[in-house]
């Protein structure tokens, strides 16, 4: 990335070799989550993350992500974590609670532990929107995890 000044800038590194990645995936909206996971795994492979360096943990839903992610982050076994899930709007206020609180919890875990977490919990109005977004969001989560793990090693 070029800048117009003489300030040194760290370019992103997308090399996953040797990185240990933890993934927490919801069982709720399972077909969407499996689509996200498939795209994420494919991208992790492409970035050089070895399958034996990836651990997948299933949780019931999006509100359970922060606790599982916190425990994984505190273990010091992972360079980065990925949250995979899908919250589809229904007819009640529950959507807002789950969406907001899971996101807040994930951010809190990152800041508390210093372990980067790529948030690939889709929050959508319809299942169709989720299916349209899941492949790119899954790939993006893998890239974010690898980029942030490498960045934090350099800071």
Curated annotation (Swiss-Prot):
Q: In the UniProt entry, which residues are flagged as the active site?
A: 94
Q: Which positions does UniProt annotate for 5-amino-6-(D-ribitylamino)uracil binding? A: 28, 62-64, 86-88, 119
Any one GO molecular-function label of the UniProt entry: 6,7-dimethyl-8-ribityllumazine synthase activity
- UniProt keyword terms in alphabetical order: Riboflavin biosynthesis, Transferase
Q: List, alphabetically, the Pfam families matched.
A: DMRL_synthase
**Which GO CC terms are listed, alphabetically?**
cytosol; riboflavin synthase complex
Q: Which terms under GO biological process does the entry name?
A: riboflavin biosynthetic process
Q: Does the keyword Transferase apply?
A: yes
Pathway, per record: Cofactor biosynthesis; riboflavin biosynthesis; riboflavin from 2-hydroxy-3-oxobutyl phosphate and 5-amino-6-(D-ribitylamino)uracil: step 1/2
Binding annotation for (2S)-2-hydroxy-3-oxobutyl phosphate? 91-92, 133
Which reaction(s) are listed as its catalytic activity? (2S)-2-hydroxy-3-oxobutyl phosphate + 5-amino-6-(D-ribitylamino)uracil = 6,7-dimethyl-8-(1-D-ribityl)lumazine + phosphate + 2 H2O + H(+)
Q: What is its EC number?
A: 2.5.1.78
KW Membrane (keyword) present: no
Q: Which family does it belong to?
A: Belongs to the DMRL synthase family.
Read off the HAMAP family from this record: Lumazine_synth
Role summary: Catalyzes the formation of 6,7-dimethyl-8-ribityllumazine by condensation of 5-amino-6-(D-ribitylamino)uracil with 3,4-dihydroxy-2-butanone 4-phosphate. This is the penultimate step in the biosynthesis of riboflavin.
Q: State the protein's name.
A: 6,7-dimethyl-8-ribityllumazine synthase
Q: Name its species.
A: Thiobacillus denitrificans (strain ATCC 25259 / T1)
What is this protein's gene name? ribH
């Amino acid at each position: 990335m070029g800048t117009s000044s003489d300030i040194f800038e760290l370019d992103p590194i997308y090399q996953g070799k040797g990185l240990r990645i933890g993934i927490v995936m919801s069982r709720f909206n399972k077909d969407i989550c499996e689509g996200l996971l498939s795209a994420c795994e494919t991208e992790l492979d492409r970035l050089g993350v070895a399958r034996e360096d990836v651990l997948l943990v299933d949780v019931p839903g999006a509100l359970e992500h922060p606790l599982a992610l916190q425990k994984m982050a505190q273990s010091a076994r992972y360079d980065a974590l990925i949250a995979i899930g899908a919250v589809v709007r229904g007819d009640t206020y529950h959507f807002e609670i789950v969406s907001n609180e899971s996101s807040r919890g994930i951010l809190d875990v990152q800041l508390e532990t210093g372990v980067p977490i790529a948030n690939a919990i889709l929050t959508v109005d319809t299942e169709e929107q989720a299916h349209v977004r899941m492949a790119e969001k899954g790939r993006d989560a893998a890239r974010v995890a690898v980029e942030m793990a490498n960045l934090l090693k350099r800071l």
